[in-house]
């Protein structure tokens, strides 16, 4: 970003971290994204005086603990659907978006309300997440 572009961009949406797709209350499908790239981008935008709306998947608090600014708002999410819904609500108010979260491509078609007991094989039907 050069200086002339910074004057145009005052509010930015950034997505970061993984999403977890629930199988049952104790199991999920996820990935190893740390969220560090999105956190670094948020920090740079804050350093340039931009307001940052950070939609953050389940990451270790250690990764973002030093990210502190009155220009920062963090929305914590868990699933791809939650990330989609948060972004759809926030994005219309933004000047730009940086989408670097590791969003799941698939989610279980159904989820169990109780822990699934271990008995033989388990088949999980996956359906695409919403883009």
Question: What is the predicted function of each stretch?
Answer:
Residues 1-131:
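A cross-family phosphate/adenosyl-ligand binding-site feature
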């Amino acid at each position: 970003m050069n200086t002339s572009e910074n004057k145009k961009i005052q509010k930015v949406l950034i997505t970061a971290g993984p999403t977890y797709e629930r199988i049952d209350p104790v199991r999920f499908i996820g990935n190893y994204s740390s969220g560090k790239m999105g956190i670094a981008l948020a920090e740079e935008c804050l350093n340039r005086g931009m307001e940052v709306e950070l939609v953050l998947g389940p990451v270790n608090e250690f990764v973002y603990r030093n990210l502190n600014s009155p220009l920062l708002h963090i929305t914590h999410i868990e699933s791809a659907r939650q990330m989609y819904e948060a972004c759809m609500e926030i994005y219309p108010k933004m000047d730009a978006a940086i989408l670097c979260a590791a969003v799941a491509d698939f989610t279980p078609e159904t989820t169990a309300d109780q822990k699934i007991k271990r008995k033989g094989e388990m088949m999980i039907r996956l359906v695409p997440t919403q883009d």
